[in-house]
Swiss-Prot record:
Organism placement in taxonomy: Bacteria, Pseudomonadati, Pseudomonadota, Gammaproteobacteria, Alteromonadales
Name the record gives this protein: Aspartate/glutamate leucyltransferase
Protein family per UniProt: Belongs to the R-transferase family. Bpt subfamily.
Catalytic activity: N-terminal L-glutamyl-[protein] + L-leucyl-tRNA(Leu) = N-terminal L-leucyl-L-glutamyl-[protein] + tRNA(Leu) + H(+); N-terminal L-aspartyl-[protein] + L-leucyl-tRNA(Leu) = N-terminal L-leucyl-L-aspartyl-[protein] + tRNA(Leu) + H(+)
Listed GO biological process terms: ubiquitin-dependent protein catabolic process via the N-end rule pathway
Chief place of localization: cytoplasm
Top-rank EC class of the record's enzyme: transferase
Length: 237
């Protein structure tokens, strides 16, 4: 961050971790009502993430399981499995839209209630969806995947000066065989290349949580360490 740039940072109370049952979670939270895109992207480079209007970063007293991960767009090479995913989804139409819709929420509700009924986001509600996904000072884009007009999947995506940030993805569980979660990331990578972006930020890799350990499959990738961003080419951190 430039030496002339200052932001206020608060710290949350300890609370039960949403991802690891035996851990307590604590967050650094940016205390600014508005962030311009350049500052927001710089905070991403420092390991922060967006949830709704909030910008946060884990600062847990006894755990460092959350590892910020990004994929360099120009270096990315899909694996054989990812190529098969692309092949079986070549009949899908990709749309980029700038507004959320009732159709998006209906799909989100179905996804949460069927796939994450054992998690903290269940049961889904419109208020929860809007608070989590939307942002007043940086409206996201929405990557849609459609099959003959039917909405199958959505990736909520922030567009920054030199990167895309994957905020959240949801899809129709009735089409599990299509690997739509993976397809959405591959689509974001392709869109980032078309936009001449340098990175796609995928969020936090958490090896100990089976639902949060997929990000390292998109290679090569970089993880944020105490020494800066570190390059990896294998599936293990």
């Amino acid at each position: 961050m430039e030496s002339s740039t200052h932001v206020s940072v608060g710290i949350s109370q300890l609370f039960q971790c949403s991802y690891l049952e035996d851990q307590q979670e604590q967050l650094l939270i940016i205390q600014e009502p508005f962030l311009d895109p350049l500052l927001f992207e710089r905070l991403l480079q420092l390991g922060f993430r967006r949830s709704g209007d909030a910008i946060y970063k884990p600062r847990c007293p006894s755990c460092s399981a959350c590892i910020a991960l990004r994929v360099p767009v120009r270096s990315f090479q899909p694996s054989k499995r990812q190529k098969r995913t692309l092949a079986k989804n070549k009949d899908l139409t990709v749309n980029w839209v700038n507004e959320s819709s009732d159709e998006h929420y209906a799909l989100y509700e179905k996804y949460i209630n069927l796939r994450h009924f054992d998690g903290p986001m269940f049961p889904a509600s419109r208020e929860q969806y809007e608070h989590f996904v939307l942002c007043d000072w940086a409206p996201p884009g929405f990557v849609e995947l459609r099959l003959e007009g039917k909405l199958l999947a959505v990736a909520v995506t922030d567009v920054l000066p030199t990167s895309l940030s994957a905020i959240y993805s949801f899809f129709d569980p009735d089409f599990d065989a299509r690997s739509l979660g993976s397809q959405l990331i591959l689509t974001q990578m392709a869109l980032a290349a078309d936009m001449d972006k340098a990175f796609v930020y995928l969020g936090y890799q958490i090896d100990a949580n089976r639902k949060m350990c997929y990000k390292r499959l998109y290679r090569p990738y970089q993880i944020l360490t105490q020494n800066g961003w570190e390059f990896h080419t294998n599936a293990n951190l």
